[in-house]
Amino acid sequence: LLAIFAMMLHRTHQVHIASVGRVGDSEQFRNIERHTATTFDGLLLLRIDESLYFGNAQSVHANLMRLSDDTNIHDIVLIMTAVNHIDLSAQEMLCAFNQSCIKRGQHLHLAEVKGPMMDILKTSPVIENLSGCIFLSANQAVQSLTKPSTDL
């Protein structure tokens, strides 16, 4: 039983975070290392492929910081389709990442957050202090964030 728990902890500690892009003209977004996909200037789309909790929050934070460390990136979208659970430690990690984004002049957005997850997050500091927006889909995020500015 202890071995099974150790294996599970090890597997969930190393969360896969994929940089994704649009496949063709579709509304599908896939890992740019595995598929021919279009990326967008100034926009980083990252799909988190595991639930977030105390056991992986530190490694997720380190990976997010590494992947977003580019002065050309203005908007970061975390695609949360595979995130079924988030504990308090992971919420604190997302708040810290959001603050890092703000300091670097970046906006952090969330997309495809499941209903039960949103129920947890909607009263948390994650949403209260989010520097960006919450989108229903990655496609909606891309459409909104890649529109030419109409400010004069």
Predicted regions and their residues:
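Intrinsically disordered or compositionally simple regulatory linkers and C-terminal tails
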Residues: Q143-L152
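Low-complexity, intrinsically disordered or weakly predicted helical/coil tracts enriched
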Residues: T71, K114, A138, L145-T146
